[in-house]
Amino acid sequence: MGLPWYRVHTVVLNDPGRLLSVHIMHTALVAGWAGSMALYELAVFDPSDPVLDPMWRQGMFVIPFMTRLGITNSWGGWSITGGTVTNPGIWSYEGVAGSHIVFSGLCFLAAIWHWVYWDLEIFCDERTGKPSLDLPKIFGIHLFLSGVACFGFGVFHVTGLYGPGIWVSDPYGLTGKVQPVNPAWGVEGFDPFVPGGIASHHIAAGTLGILAGLFHLSVRPPQRLYKGLRMGNIETVLSSSIAAVFFAAFVVAGTMWYGSATTPIELFGPTRYQWDQGYFQQEIYRRVSAGLAENKSLSEAWSKIPEKLAFYDYIGNNPAKGGLFRAGSMDNGDGIAVGWLGHPIFRDKEGRELFVRRMPTFFETFPVVLVDGDGIVRADVPFRRAESKYSVEQVGVTLEFYGGELNGVSYSDPAVVKKYARRAQLGEIFELDRATLKSDGVFRSSPRGWFTFGHASFALLFFFGHIWHGARTLFRDVFAGIDPDLDAQVEFGAFQKLGDPTTRREVV
């Protein structure tokens, strides 16, 4: 046929059988990738430390999506929440991966069958005997079926009526587990961080889809609308489908980057805004203050802070710190976290408590500045020692650790104090193992960042595709030069402009 690579899809333009075949093959590829990727991730995943080396630190991409839908156990005998499992059942991580691969194989065979047996009676218009598709009717069928799936997911899977529920956690990502969720029918259901909204919105959207599907199955479109929107043209279907996909991609890019109940931080890592707003730092200070109010010592209050909460309050877990083109997991960047050293409290020689100014997200380097409780600069690590007035040596800054591995340890050596002041810029201080993975010390993004970048990029690309194919189908007659309502037989090549008898070529 001699088609250029960018026009090869025209072979299925008027061939419903093979159009179906290539879509089944596409499903086979998607399901096959998902299953294969899951098996690869399971082969490299280390489940031994869910607190300091969770899935998102290891760069897992598909495991978090399985987990949020209720899969927590492995046939390897481990659970995502830690501990061992004796009877994981068929729906383990490996079970889901295997089912996708089996499904992919079946779709592959079905695609081959439909490619070979393309000329089926079901695709023929009995009035003309030519292949044709009743696109408005097919739209109704698909809308109805997707509505049933959506409704069923909300009613059965999410609520636990027939299914495991979904991953639910507290606002600080400490107590997450899979559990049934009751639908939230009040105004709280519109809060993106309320899990009940997931159930209620799937039920509502599914109901709407079922009703809309039945409507489109039972009511034919008016002729003017049918012609105006080119409802008989398969490229109209392509254009509107691309619109649905790019809209969904934009939505999920937003819910992933800004955070929501559908993207728990235990599975995908914290958001950048939680670092920017000092979200975890405030909660840690609140807990310490509550401990002090109960007459606990500073050491006891800090020792009660969960290591998991302290780990979230570390800039290396900020997805915006990794460059877009730095390959590898977070563990390949700053290393595998081994333990929390504790919270450093700095004091000057007058006994004032000093706080290290934290590094903003988009800085690679940042001056080390220590301020007091009123925000007044009291000490720093100067760039020019000759000009310094607030150096650690001049101010006499000392340091003591509370909680963590160095609980109760104090330092007065200026070199050591400055070392920990620099590290305190990055949040809570952790011991990191860079040797095991040969980590290079350069921050990486989490799967939250990759997902957002990928979906935002493809959404922009698909937006262009929607405009392109929408314009092609709406203005096909203009582009082709043929009036779509032209009854006369057009001889291709007879005219310089297709269908325009005033431009008949001269016979030489």
Curated annotation (Swiss-Prot):
Membrane-topology annotation of the record: Multi-pass membrane protein
Family the entry assigns: Belongs to the PsbB/PsbC family. PsbB subfamily.
GO MF, one example: electron transporter, transferring electrons within the cyclic electron transport pathway of photosynthesis activity
Cofactor note: Binds multiple chlorophylls. PSII binds additional chlorophylls, carotenoids and specific lipids.
A cellular component annotation (GO) from this entry: photosystem II
Swiss-Prot/TrEMBL keywords: Chlorophyll, Chloroplast, Chromophore, Membrane, Photosynthesis, Photosystem II, Plastid, Thylakoid, Transmembrane, Transmembrane helix
Subcellular localization: Plastid, Chloroplast thylakoid membrane
Transmembrane segments: 21-36, 101-115, 140-156, 203-218, 237-252, 457-472
Keyword match Transmembrane: yes
Listed SUPFAM superfamilies: Photosystem II antenna protein-like
SUBUNIT field: PSII is composed of 1 copy each of membrane proteins PsbA, PsbB, PsbC, PsbD, PsbE, PsbF, PsbH, PsbI, PsbJ, PsbK, PsbL, PsbM, PsbT, PsbX, PsbY, PsbZ, Psb30/Ycf12, at least 3 peripheral proteins of the oxygen-evolving complex and a large number of cofactors. It forms dimeric complexes.
Protein name according to UniProt: Photosystem II CP47 reaction center protein
Task performed by this protein: One of the components of the core complex of photosystem II (PSII). It binds chlorophyll and helps catalyze the primary light-induced photochemical processes of PSII. PSII is a light-driven water:plastoquinone oxidoreductase, using light energy to abstract electrons from H(2)O, generating O(2) and a proton gradient subsequently used for ATP formation.
Biological process annotations from GO: photosynthetic electron transport in photosystem II
Gene3D superfamilies noted in UniProt: Photosystem II CP47 reaction center protein (3.10.680.10)
Record organism: Jasminum nudiflorum (Winter jasmine)
